[in-house]
Amino acid sequence: MSQHTSQYVFNSKEDYNVILDNMSREFEERWNHQTQSPYTNLENYITRAVLGNGSFGTVMLVREKSGKNYYAAKMMSKEDLVRLKQVAHVHNEKHVLNAARFPFLIYLVDSTKCFDYLYLILPLVNGGELFSYHRRVRKFNEKHARFYAAQVALALEYMHKMHLMYRDLKPENILLDQRGYIKITDFGFTKRVDGRTSTLCGTPEYLAPEIVQLRPYNKSVDWWAFGILVYEFVAGRSPFAIHNRDVILMYSKICICDYKMPSYFTSQLRSLVESLMQVDTSKRLGNSNDGSSDVKSHPWFQGVDWFGILNQEVTAPYQPTISGAEDLSNFENFEFKDRYKSRINRHPELFANF
C-alpha cells in the first residue's frame, strides 16, 4: 500500500495472521517516519462547505487547487487545544492517522498549519455518520448489525495488532462511505501501549468499569465498548443510558453491569453481548492472546465472509444516496464561522512537531 491510500487486496488463501504481521511492519515504518507540517495554511485547497463542528475543531469540505479531488479538512484552533489540554491528543491523532492503513480506518492524506490553526487533510467520506443513519431507522436487524460489527471487529483487531488502544468507539465516530462500508475516525484518544494504562478518557456511556474505577486497563476496554455498540445497534439505545443524564448513576450501573437485555435478541446475540460486557476482565471475550479470533469465531458471527468483508465484496444492506462530491445531504447544515488571523505564531514550541 502507498502512503496515501488504504487500498489493499486481501488474498483468502493467505494466513490472515501473516498478513497482519506484514501490515504491522509497514505500520512500524510509517510510525517511525513522521514529518513536520508546513506553514502553508490551506493555500493548496479551496474551502467549499462545513461538514461538522466538534468540541476540538471544525471539519470542512475542501477541493485541491491543482486537481479535482475532494477531501475533509479538520481545522483545530491552537488556542482551544491549549486551553482544553488537548495538545498531546492532537499530536497523537496525527501520528496514528499517518501510520495506520486499513480498509475501515480513516488515514492522513496531508497536514498543514498556520499561526492560529492546525489542519489534518483526510479522505472525504460523504455518506454521513453511522449515528445519524441509526437514529433515523432507530434499530438494525441482526443481519444489518452484523455487517457493521464485523468491520468494527476487524478494525479493532488491526489496531490492537499495532499496539493501539482506540478508546473512543461509538456510532458518532463511524462514517459511511458511498458503498455503505464504514470508516472509523477521530483518533484523539488512541494510545500506543504494549500493556496497561490508566488515563480516564472516552465517552461515559461506553466506558468499561475499570476505566470508571480509575484502575489500570488494557485493550479489552475496546471489546467492552464493542459489546455496547452491538447492543445499541439492535436495541436502538445504549444499555446504560440514563434519561436524566445522571453520570454518577450511569457509572454505578456500569460498574455492576446493571442493564436489561431485550427479549427479541437471539440467543447468539445475547451470548455475544454478555461475553463482551464482563466486569471481570479475565472472563471478557477478546481479552486473551488470541482475543480477536475469539470474538470473530463467536456463534453470532457464524457465516460471515471475513475476506469478503475485508475486500468489500459483500453487498452493504444500505448504501447512502450521494449525487457527487459536493452532495452534503448526509450531513447537518453548518455555517462558516469567521477565522481569526494573528500576526504572531501561536504556541510555536508546542506545535513544532505537528
Swiss-Prot record:
| E.C. number(s) listed in UniProt | 2.7.11.1
Tissues where this protein is expressed:
More abundant in adult body than adult head.
Q: Which UniProt keywords apply?
A: ATP-binding, Kinase, Nucleotide-binding, Serine/threonine-protein kinase, Transferase
GO cellular component annotations of the record: cAMP-dependent protein kinase complex; cytosol; nucleotide-activated protein kinase complex; nucleus
As one GO molecular function, the record gives:
ATP binding
* Pfam families xrefs: Pkinase (PF00069)
Any idea which positions bind ATP? 51-59, 74
Note the InterPro entries from the entry. Answer: AGC-kinase_C, Kinase-like_dom_sf, Prot_kinase_dom, Protein_kinase_ATP_BS, Ser/Thr_kinase_AS
Instruction: List the active-site residues.
Output: 168 (proton acceptor)
Q: Where in the numbering of this chain does the Protein kinase domain appear? A: 45-301
Reactions it catalyzes: L-seryl-[protein] + ATP = O-phospho-L-seryl-[protein] + ADP + H(+); L-threonyl-[protein] + ATP = O-phospho-L-threonyl-[protein] + ADP + H(+)
Q: Which SUPFAM superfamilies match?
A: Protein kinase-like (PK-like)
Catalytic class of the enzyme:
transferase
Annotated AGC-kinase C-terminal domain residues: 302-354
What sections of the sequence does the record tag as coiled-coil? none
Q: Which GO terms describe its biological process?
A: signal transduction
**Family of the protein in this entry:** Belongs to the protein kinase superfamily. AGC Ser/Thr protein kinase family. cAMP subfamily.
Q: What is this protein called?
A: cAMP-dependent protein kinase catalytic subunit 2
